[in-house]
Amino acid sequence: MNKQDYIDGAESALLHTYNRFPLVIDHGDGVYLYDTDGKEYLDFAAGIAVQAFGYNNKEYNDALKAQIDKVMHTSNLYYNVPIMNAAKRVFKASQMNRVFFTNSGTEAIEGAIKAAKKYAYTRDGHAGHEIIAMNHSFHGRSIGALSV
């Protein structure tokens, strides 16, 4: 398939959530992305600033493969070893003693709203109703996140 075939296929098959650049990524290595024509690009976007791991990092890939061989994902209904190990690393690197892991920024915003309301209720006897946020900023696609 050529570049235009990929673009046409994506336009007809994928929900149009963003205006995309006419660039079809084939693979990445380090901080670079490569298109289907082999052209190299320095990746400044990094998953729109939420996944700045780079590409094809051997240490990261090996750790990911080792974890996938054990367990890739479980529900929050269960306790699991990897999440406790991750929590301990966060505690060691910070002054926190409790952590809330999520799968997305939207879930982080929703969790922050709920935590703030719970805090206000515990402190004042009623849930707070005002949220301070950056104007015209992206907070996620859920109803709660869109309301911020």
What are these regions (language model features)?
Residues P22-D43:
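Active-site and channel-lining beta-strand-loop segments
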